[in-house]
Amino acid sequence: GQENATWYRSHFAAVFSEYHLFERLYGLYDMEPERVRELLVTMQISDKTSFEGARFTTLDLSQGQRKRLALLVAILENRPILVLDEWAADQDPSFRRYFYEELLPQLKREGRTVIAVTHDDKYFNVADRVVKMEYGEIVPAAAA
């Protein structure tokens, strides 16, 4: 019931393939502006938008850059489990590599569990565990 919903909301952050961005960081009232600026650099969008007066200066970004900003906000929520639905699909090859080979391992070192839904089989080797689904069903590991 409500207890489970509250638990899930406090433990999961997500960036789905369909998402919405806000200029303000709602619900993140004690956020240090310097931490936001560091993440803008990490996401390689500090030259496109900045964080001033508790808001982003622009959301007028490419689709890939908007997804980076959405991931930045999810990271700031500081929840232990991060669900990313086809997150890398809109990223250029360079940032996609950075995401899988640098950013995901960093999130793991920070103690986060990342569930990355992806078709990027080139990067399956980065995962601790790969779960394959076909037609909405999990395929046994031997068949995957």
Regions found by a protein language model. Give the residues of each.
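Conserved D-loop/post-Walker B switch-helix segment of ABC ATPase nucleotide-binding domains
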Residues: 92-102
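Conserved "ABC signature" C-loop
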Residues: 15-57
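H-loop (His-switch) and adjacent beta-strand-loop-beta switch element
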Residues: 119, 126-143
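Hydrophobic anchor residue at the start of the ABC signature
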Residues: 69-71
